[in-house]
Amino acid sequence: MKKKGSISDFTALRNRELLASFRDVLATSRGVPLRDMFGLAVKRPASRFWVSEYRAAEVICAMLRGETIDNQLPQRKAMYDEIYRRVVEWRRENPGRPVSDAVTAVVNSAAPEFYLTEKSAKVIIYSLRRKNKTGDNDE
């Protein structure tokens, strides 16, 4: 389980990609209220699934054993359901290969969305914009 406040190796990349998605929504969605643009930004495709291969392997292996993952937020559950679906398909096309290979391939493939809440996106985007204004881009 992820520890509160832990930061993944790819968090800065995810945040930059989310900000770019938001800026694209701003540029192309005339007449849409700002509060709705965060939701539009997170529903756009992402370059990968924003979860570590290790954590995804833990959850997918549990799902393959028949364990449920009902204790997760809806967006996170939807992400793991999509990863699971793709892992099952990948294994069907690549019999005999380990689950870890399937998870690695899937997690590093394009994702249909960011799997974040609108509120999370808003917090991330405003934080990045604040850092950009102050010149504090350490992330």
Over which residues does each language-model region extend?
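Basic, amphipathic alpha-helix used for nucleic-acid engagement in HTH/winged-helix/SANT-Myb modules
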Residues: M1-T28, L34-R92, D136-E139
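Short coil/turn residues that cap or connect secondary-structure elements
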Residues: S29, N94-P95, A110
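Short, basic interhelical loop/turn and adjoining N-cap
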Residues: V42-C61, V107-S127
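Sequence-specific DNA-binding recognition helix
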Residues: S100-T104, N108
